[in-house]
Amino acid sequence: MRVSASVKKICRNCKIIRRKGVVRVICTDMRHKQRQG
């Protein structure tokens, strides 16, 4: 899980979603998991 100020899609499988006001990136590649905070 990478925590960054701005989350970006890395590949075409990445999806940007909001959970409880937190912006997250979920992907089939676990290295691409990110959250904003």
From Swiss-Prot:
Keywords: Ribonucleoprotein, Ribosomal protein. It comes from the Bacteria. GO terms for biological process: translation. One of its GO terms (molecular function) is structural constituent of ribosome. PANTHER family: 50S RIBOSOMAL PROTEIN L36, CHLOROPLASTIC, LARGE RIBOSOMAL SUBUNIT PROTEIN BL36C. HAMAP family: Ribosomal_bL36. This is Large ribosomal subunit protein bL36. It comes from Paracidovorax citrulli (strain AAC00-1).
